[in-house]
Amino acid sequence: HLSIRRQRQMCIRDRYNTLCEYTFTESSQQMDYSYRTLFAGALEDAKQVLEKTTNPADRFATTILRAYAFQIMVDNTSDSPYSEALQGNANATPKWDTGETVYKGILGEIDAAEAALDGSGMDVPDLIFNKNIAQWKGFANALRLRMYLRFIDANIDAASYTEKVKTLVQNNEFFTGDVKLDCFLDETDKRNPWYNTNAVGLTGNHCAAYPLISYLSSTGDPLSLIH
């Protein structure tokens, strides 16, 4: 039993053993967690905002968040529903577009939304940048940079995207500080829900698993001392 448990977290902690052992099945929550969270949550919310508002600044910020969600999805699954996504029961089995198609699509969305800005401010509450459009533009540029680098790494129009990277870096118009929902406090019932559940309620389960520790130790990685 000890040899089995050594492959896991610790003898007294077993919440994430399925992750350590890669014992996933088709019914495992982890298999489609990103898909369900992003499409049923974030992307559906963004769709509703875009359908209801005509304010260019609100649409710009929402488009950036929509692009960010799709970018994460592509990084997780390579291909992703995009051109036929978010139609609900009208199309319950949307086509999965290539990551290249999705990236180019959302880059175009960002460009169009930014071009539509007319100097007006945001109407909706903004818990990320406090309605600072310059910061939203900086976030958009950071997303562009990330996707350009992905294209270069995949050798897709590498020369063209290399020039785009050089231009972004030279202009240096990125956000400052952090991109975060700045509305939580370290007080009961006021913490980030994820933090409240995992960092406060399940602290003991947050320990490095045996496969990680054994690898770090065998390679002499100083991170083993931290973990």
Question: What is each of the regions a protein language model found here?
Answer:
Residues H1-R8, I12, I226-H227:
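Single conserved hydrophobic/aromatic residue that forms the stacking wall/gate
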Residues R15-I226:
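Structured, solvent-exposed acidic/aromatic patches
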